[in-house]
């Protein structure tokens, strides 16, 4: 279809060109024809390329072909097939000898590239349906899809491959049994975790998924301003209705919120707060409690802590420590750095720490607390740079104590400088460091979830409107 449209457009341009060169039309018409020809060719080329990429990103059959083994092609994926649940669960549990991460093959890399495109460009509905792994069927026979906390972290972490035989609308089926499910709560979330408060087993519904991504992608300062705007009586508290307004406004400013559309056919619609376990958590069982900004920011801090803990545990720490290379991978996960440069940075890290002692979760958490104040850190580092002081490890530790009130260990600073000390002179490349760390802090959730085609066409139309009048006027 794109080829036919392109050929027809080029044919019309050729006819117009012959008419333009063969006649003696006024100068104004010729200039308009030149402008139309240029814009038409640019639009056809851009739309063909971008829509072709879009088709690849949105096409579900691709991953089915990639993730299906030859021997499994005849398997029945019926949603009511509960008999194979134990077998699927056993397949998903890693064996002790398989804990060491294998090197990704060609097929795995292609699957991860496809999943990264889903994370980057798909709607929240499709992302949720792809990375969720559980479908719970209640007693009346109605089914609802849920994410586990591990599924949630995987849905926002690049290059984390979905388990085999689970993908878009492919789930592990569970029959609802209140007693049995309450006994399985510890399988999904530790007691004291934010996820433990999310209803049954710490499972995440679609409404909770949208809310949690909104909390993770919104700076603390934005919530403080929103709470003050809707705190009409000035007592520092908001009720449930006011919180719904705060939540709706904040969500509409995020990339997830802007891309979401209710899909009744898939069951993924944003429900009101009355149905959310989070609303019960904030306002009590009778929903008549009050929520303060202090309590909400504490919830945000705990959520960030729990997500970071899950990321840490995914690396299978040995004696409570992960390797320096794994920590570097956590820092660069959302960087968007080109693959060649990323590989070079990881090799440099491996060269410096062939037999490193590793990092504890406390060291990792202290560094990410430091990153939460990255804007203030950027200002402080700029002051040091303008004053002519070198940005060495001692300076970074001083900035961490002053700005974030945390202590960075010497070993953490060694790892960071091994990544971002490009010329090996012991000084930090602060511009690249701050840029990558800002993306890491937001986990890529602030990026627009589109191919940029609409923005391109709007820019071209605006440019055409501004320049058309100049082309139409004859030169004096």
Curated annotation (Swiss-Prot):
Compartment annotation: Mitochondrion intermembrane space; Mitochondrion inner membrane
Residue segments, region K/R-ring: 126-129, 259-263
Region entry Polybasic region, spans: 99-110
Positions carrying Phosphoserine: 122
PROSITE patterns: EF_HAND_1 (PS00018), EF_HAND_2 (PS50222)
Keywords for the protein's UniProt record, in alphabetical order: Calcium, Calcium transport, Disulfide bond, Ion transport, Membrane, Metal-binding, Methylation, Mitochondrion, Mitochondrion inner membrane, Phosphoprotein, Repeat, Transit peptide, Transport
Main location: mitochondrion
GO term, biological process aspect, one: mitochondrial calcium ion homeostasis
Every EF-hand domain range: 218-253, 408-443
Record bears the keyword Membrane: yes
Segments for region (Disordered): 68-106
Region (C-helix region): 455-465
Listed name of the protein: Calcium uptake protein 1, mitochondrial
Source organism of the structure: Macaca fascicularis
GN (gene name): MICU1
């Amino acid at each position: 279809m794109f080829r036919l449209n392109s050929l027809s457009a080029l044919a019309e341009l050729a006819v117009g060109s012959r008419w333009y060169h063969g006649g003696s039309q006024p100068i104004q018409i010729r200039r308009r024809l030149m402008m139309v020809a240029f814009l038409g060719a640019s639009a056809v080329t851009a739309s063909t390329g971008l829509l072709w990429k879009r088709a690849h990103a949105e096409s579900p059959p691709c991953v089915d072909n990639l993730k299906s083994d030859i021997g499994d092609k005849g398997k029945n994926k019926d949603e009511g097939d509960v008999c194979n649940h134990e077998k699927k669960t056993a397949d998903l549990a890693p064996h002790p000898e398989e804990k060491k991460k294998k090197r990704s093959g060609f097929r795995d890399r292609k699957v991860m590239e496809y999943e990264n495109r889903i994370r980057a460009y798909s709607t929240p509905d499709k992302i949720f349906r792809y990375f969720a792994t559980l479908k719970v069927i209640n007693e009346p026979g109605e089914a609802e899809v849920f994410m586990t906390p591990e599924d949630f972290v995987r849905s926002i972490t690049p290059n984390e491959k979905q388990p085999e035989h689970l993908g878009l609308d492919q789930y592990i089926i569970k029959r609802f049994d209140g007693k049995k499910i309450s006994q399985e709560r510890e399988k999904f979330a530790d007691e004291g975790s934010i996820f433990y408060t999310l209803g049954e087993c710490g499972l995440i519904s679609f409404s909770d998924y949208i809310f949690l991504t909104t909390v993770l992608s919104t700076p603390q300062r934005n919530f403080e301003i929103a709470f003050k705007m809707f705190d009409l009586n000035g007592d520092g508290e908001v009720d449930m209705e006011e919180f719904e307004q705060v939540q709706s406004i904040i969500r509409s400013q995020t990339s997830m919120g802007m891309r979401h559309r209710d899909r009744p056919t898939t069951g993924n619609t944003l429900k009101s707060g009355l149905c959310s376990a989070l609303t019960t958590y904030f306002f009590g069982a009778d929903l008549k409690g009050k929520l303060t900004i202090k309590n909400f920011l504490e919830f945000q801090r705990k959520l960030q802590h729990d997500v970071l803990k899950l990321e840490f545990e995914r690396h299978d720490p040995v004696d409570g420590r992960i390797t320096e290379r794994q920590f570097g991978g956590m820092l660069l996960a959302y960087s968007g750095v080109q693959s060649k440069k990323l590989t070079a940075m990881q090799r440099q890290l491996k060269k410096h720490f062939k037999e490193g002692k590793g990092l504890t979760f406390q060291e990792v958490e202290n560094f990410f607390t430091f990153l939460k104040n990255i804007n203030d850190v950027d200002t402080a580092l700029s002051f040091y740079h303008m004053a002519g002081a070198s940005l060495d490890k001692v300076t970074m530790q001083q900035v961490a104590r002053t700005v974030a009130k945390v202590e960075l260990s010497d070993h953490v600073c060694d790892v960071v400088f091994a990544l971002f000390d490009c010329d090996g002179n012991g000084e930090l490349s602060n511009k690249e460091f701050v840029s990558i760390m800002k993306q890491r802090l937001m986990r890529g959730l602030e990026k627009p979830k589109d191919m940029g085609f609409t923005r391109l066409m709007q820019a071209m139309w605006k440019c055409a409107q501004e320049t058309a009048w100049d082309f139409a006027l004859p030169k004096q």
